């Protein structure tokens, strides 16, 4: 059964290239305009290579990190746009001599230690006859949990919100059910998420879950290289269009209007549309760039705020592993407190921003220690994902539940406390719901019986004549 797993999540050449670029970045001997595109090219190549093999979760995590920690910042440093509060707070050399090695080594270690799954082979033996029932069952549970979450706060609310995401796992079951209405059912499972995003103009969760569902669906068959490049190109164009309209779209919603998302995107992306104006391009770079927050941390720590020396990591582990009654003062998930503390910048009431693992690593140990912490984080994530994939060999249907465990880990802006909370509590919820579902609607593994044919007995000519 081990043929279903690839021991590494990237080619040896890709891993070596990432490491070399990271070391060159630490010296800043070569322009970042050359180094960052190389890193992006390697990660995009590894992502597309496994896109039709199985959900490339580690590669997707790497791609998002590279885009937000390296590509966004290099664009921000190399143009004349005005960014105001969202400016880079340290010079380019200072930022990239930390961010380039920390990011590339984080990605390289994670992909080297992690594994990739061969989805088609893994799921080929599953009996899919109960998949529609499971999808409906998970939607009912998810909706009940969603309404229950509105009545609670704190840890209990977080638990119900986790359970409410069972609807999206139900959508994956629908996609693999082979039912003639499977796409309609999957769309219905995602409908509240889509409507919520469109109504308030907050698209992050919607985009991430849609990307995960697309990866599951895409890997059901092999695609040509051209088809994969076309898919990535169209996705990139869609994301760019969404970023450039987002500000105006939200402004219209605040005025009580009902803007059309599709119409605005088409208008902005036309040859004479607003998407190509300096202001819109600057806004798109700001949306992509997580580096402005990281640079603010580097500017503020240790000049105004001393290094945390692992303090936030201890709080994250405590928050993830200890129940509230054992640690009543444990840290709650959310980035507002760390953002204000480590950047020195203020946030409006009700606004929360994370400083990202890269920013938090620097806030704890500075450049040198932060690089090693990011390597350790990559190793931890890669090992945990590999361990999860090995469990799938015996329980293939749990493959559909992986997003519930690793959802927050994919993001590039979430802090360690959020990541560890999702990993620990998401794993518990995923296992509990998986077994509860299996108890009611078991997914059996088909058993293939090889027919044996009796050997043909050869009769000598003498005996035949007799």
What are these regions (language model features)?
Residues 35-41, 101-109, 164, 363-382:
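Hydrophobic alpha-helical transmembrane segments
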Residues 153-154, 350-466:
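Hydrophobic alpha-helical segments
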